[in-house]
A protein has these predicted regions:
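Basic, glycine-rich
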Residues: 124
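Conserved PRPP/pyrophosphate-binding segment of the phosphoribosyltransferase/PRPP-pathway fold
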Residues: 1-119, 127-162
Length: 162
């Protein structure tokens, strides 16, 4: 489920939350996202940041969105389901092949989830590389159904090699 494409005004709202610390955008965006979800998964999780990036930024925008969305939908949120065990360069501007390589072994599942239907929350999905890695971890432990809830999606970057 996605609110829309990465363009004005959604792109501005996401940018303000992520880079300008305008935290009031999180509940607003979560409410917009909730309107797109007819049958929510019983458990939400979010895309984790490496501890260094979280320390530098001071917060994880996907975590903020997931917390707000869980409140709006009145469902469980597990903020510790995943961890990012390896710091990776920013994904922005990388080709699909570079993103896949960049994320190799970057994530770990901290514990088996307590549900068979889970939704992963992220702010922006571009190629889906990050989401794909997290889905693989969930599928490996027997999760039956995975939904993706994001604010924006972007067109796949042009890559003549990938």
């Amino acid at each position: 489920m996605c609110v829309g494409d990465y363009r004005f005004p959604l792109s501005d709202a996401v940018h303000q939350l992520k880079y300008q610390r305008q935290f009031w955008q999180a509940p607003r965006l979560a409410k917009l996202l909730a309107t797109q979800i007819n049958e929510p998964a019983p458990l939400l999780c979010s895309v984790p940041l490496h501890w260094r990036r979280r320390w530098q930024r001071g917060f994880n925008q996907s975590d903020l969105l997931a917390r707000e969305l869980a409140n709006v939908l009145n469902i469980e949120y597990d903020h510790q389901l995943f961890a990012r065990r390896r710091a990776t360069p920013h994904q922005q501007g990388l080709s699909k092949a570079q993103r896949i390589h960049n994320l190799r072994d970057a994530f770990v599942l901290n514990h088996p989830p307590n549900q068979q239907h889970i939704a992963i929350v992220d702010d922006v999905v571009t190629t889906g590389s990050t989401i794909r890695h997290l889905c693989d971890l969930l599928l490996d432990v027997g999760v039956q159904s995975i939904d993706i809830y994001c604010i924006c999606r972007t067109p796949e970057p042009k890559d003549s090699k990938g």
